[in-house]
From Swiss-Prot:
This is L-ascorbate oxidase. Keywords: Copper, Disulfide bond, Glycoprotein, Metal-binding, Oxidoreductase, Plant defense, Repeat, Secreted, Signal. Its main location: secreted. Cu cation 4 binds at H463, C526, H531, M536. Pathway: Cofactor degradation; L-ascorbate degradation. It comes from Brassica rapa subsp. pekinensis. Its EC number is 1.10.3.3. The gene is AO. NCBIfam families: ascorbase. Belongs to the multicopper oxidase family. Its cofactor is Cu cation. Induction: Repressed progressively during incompatible Turnip mosaic virus (TuMV) infection (strain UK1) in resistant cultivars (e.g. cv. Aki-masari) but not in susceptible cultivars (e.g. cv. Yukihime-kabu). When the plant is infected by a compatible TuMV strain (UK1 m2), the down-regulation is transient and last two days. Induced by jasmonic acid (JA) and hydrogen peroxide H(2)O(2) treatments. Cu cation 2 binds at H79, H121, H527.
Length: 570
């Protein structure tokens, strides 16, 4: 049977309210024109971005994923899905499964337990940078009431795009000296951007011409067609490899109502900052002049911008679809106005009725983020350990007690008290390792992310940290070094938001709390693709004696391969 098909029929499951949604996907490279310049993209069933999955809370999703790449392994991570009872389906190569070899098919099977805006992406090498991503939208279960009221919705997947291929980028990052990937050439909205022209050329000081498109152009923007005096839900997800973004709609207020798949206390803003790995829902009311169209913009924040903002158009159906707005697009806030960014983050509170965090913690980790050298190679390290994922997936090693699958020694839970976070490290050296933090089942863990200066003076970056397998409560943010016994007094324990991704700001700290109630092994890492490639991550293992059955197909590499062969052929 040919594999260029997709099964989109929902099969009734054992309960009346849940369905099984089954898909067959092939992933391969193809030529595309994401930003009006031809390049290689990773496509799912020929689509870039990949197909959108729509499901209801409680549904089971089954994806038969075939690797049609000639020379690369493959996995897909279901970003924001907690994988309760299915840690092997999380899609993190070397952590929860082996990479799928070329020509092979692996089946993901998991339940989506609650509604929310999510996405999926490659999690092997830097395949997300190559375009392996798509949207994953979970609506409320049948018979349940959506608390938000709106007349229609749009789904916008934001990403950044380079003209240099990802393999060259990976080689450069792993070279001595390192060759940095540089800023992206374009920002894409739903896989479409414009590198050599502008939708707002008449308002720009650059020499770029006004974009003109013909039917079928892959880089032509997807306009959002709206009716006057209606309210629309815009679902935003950032799958960027590097860029932090600011999103705005000209002349319209945004009411932020959801963050990382969790309802929040609504608040109104002119624009929002969105970091790699984050998702939001905003409500927009079309209450402006219905004879006009309006720019939608996504511009770079947090890094000195060398990438033009992405643009598309909010088209009132009472105005000509091809008509461009008559005034300039919203200006992206200054890239290094971090106070503005922090103020936005501090406006996000959990919706009434959301779960509250435990009042105290059982264990605490303070994770220092540093840039270091290992034998002359530039790396990122956590408490002076740069992560190198082992050849045997952690999940297989702990499930079958394979003691040599990774280093079983405990990693540092803190860093030296005299470390100066404001200057380059006195000792630039770090070590490489594959240790994991092991926790008992159902304990409360606090994680303090501590930022610091990089290898160069006056250089501290934003790092968006993403935790697999969990939501966590964001308890607070602070400046400088975290002070145990003092800074806890600033925590928000009343209504902290539940997130799966959180920003760590330059020279500051971010505090989060989670409960180890999901047996498995879970990646926790910076969601900036090159930073993770250079070692910026840790691994949490919890409730190990409660991990259920793991399909053999997930673990057919490394030490688990031989173990399973011996077990199945005594």
């Amino acid at each position: 049977m040919g594999m260029w098909w997709i099964v989109a029929v929902a099969i009734l499951a054992h309960t009346a309210s849940a369905a099984v949604r089954e898909y067959a996907w092939e992933v391969e490279y193809k030529f595309g024109w994401p930003d009006c310049k031809e390049g290689m993209v990773m496509a799912v069933n020929g689509q870039f971005p990949g197909p959108t999955i729509h499901a209801l809370a409680g549904d089971t999703i089954v994806v038969h994923l075939t690797n049609k790449l000639a020379t690369e392994g493959l996995v897909i991570h279901w970003h924001g899905i907690r994988q309760l009872g299915s840690p092997w389906a999380d899609g993190a190569a070397g952590v929860t499964q082996c990479a799928i070899s070329p020509g092979e098919t692996f089946t993901y099977n998991f339940t989506v337990d609650k509604p929310g805006t999510h996405f999926y992406h490659g999690h092997y090498g830097m395949q997300r940078s190559a375009g392996l991503y798509g949207s994953l939208i979970i609506d409320v279960a049948k018979g349940k009431k959506e608390p938000l009221r709106y007349d229609g919705e749009f789904n916008l997947l934001l990403s950044d795009w380079w003209h240099e291929d990802v393999l060259s980028q990976e080689i450069g990052l792993s070279s001595r000296p390192m060759r940095w990937i540089g800023e992206a050439q374009s920002i894409l909205i739903n896989g479409r951007g414009q590198f050599n022209c502008s939708l707002a050329a008449q308002f720009s000081s650059t020499s770029l011409p006004t974009c003109t498109f013909k039917e079928g152009d892959q880089c032509a923007p997807q306009r959002l067609h709206v009716e006057p005096n209606k309210t629309y839900r815009i679902r935003l997800a950032s799958s960027t490899a590097l860029a932090s973004l600011n999103f705005a709609v000209q002349g319209h207020k945004l009411v932020v109502v959801e963050a990382d798949g969790n309802y929040i206390t609504p608040f109104t803003t002119d624009d929002i900052d969105i970091y790699s790995g984050e998702t939001y829902s905003v409500l927009l009311t079309t209450d402006q002049d219905p004879s006009q169209n309006y720019y939608i913009t996504a511009g770079v924040r947090g890094r000195k911008p060398n990438t033009p903002p992405a643009l598309t158009v909010l088209n009132y159906v009472t105005a000509p679809s091809s008509q461009l707005p008559t005034s300039p697009p919203p200006e992206t806030p200054r890239w290094n106005d971090f106070d503005r960014s922090k103020n936005f983050s501090k406006k996000i509170f959990a919706a009434m009725g959301s779960p509250s965090p435990p009042e105290t913690f059982d264990e605490r980790l303070i994770l220092l983020n540093t840039q270091n050298l290992i034998e002359g190679f530039t790396k990122w390290a956590i408490n002076n350990v740069s992560l190198a994922v082992p050849g045997t997936p952690y999940l297989g090693s702990v499930k079958y007690n394979l003691r040599t699958g990774f280093n079983r020694s405990s990693p540092p839970k803190d860093y030296p008290v005299d470390y100066d976070i404001m200057t380059p490290p006195r000792n630039r050296n770090a070590k490489q390792g594959n240790v994991s933090c092991v926790f008992p089942f159902n304990v409360t863990v606090d994680v303090i992310l501590q930022n610091a200066n990089g290898l160069n003076a006056n250089a501290s970056e934003i790092h968006p940290w993403h935790l697999h397998g969990h939501d966590f409560w964001v308890l607070g943010y602070g400046e400088g070094k975290f002070k145990p016994g003092v800074d806890e007094k600033t925590y928000n324990l009343k209504n902290p938001p539940l997130r799966n991704t959180v920003a760590l700001y330059p020279y500051g700290w971010t505090a989060l709390r989670f409960v180890t109630d999901n047996p498995g092994v879970w990646f926790f890492h910076c969601h900036i693709e090159p930073h993770l490639h250079m070692g910026m991550g840790v691994v949490f293992a919890e409730g190990l004696n409660r991990i259920g059955k793991v399909p053999d197909e997930a673990l057919g590499c490394g030490l688990t391969k031989q173990f399973l062969m011996n077990r199945n052929n005594p």
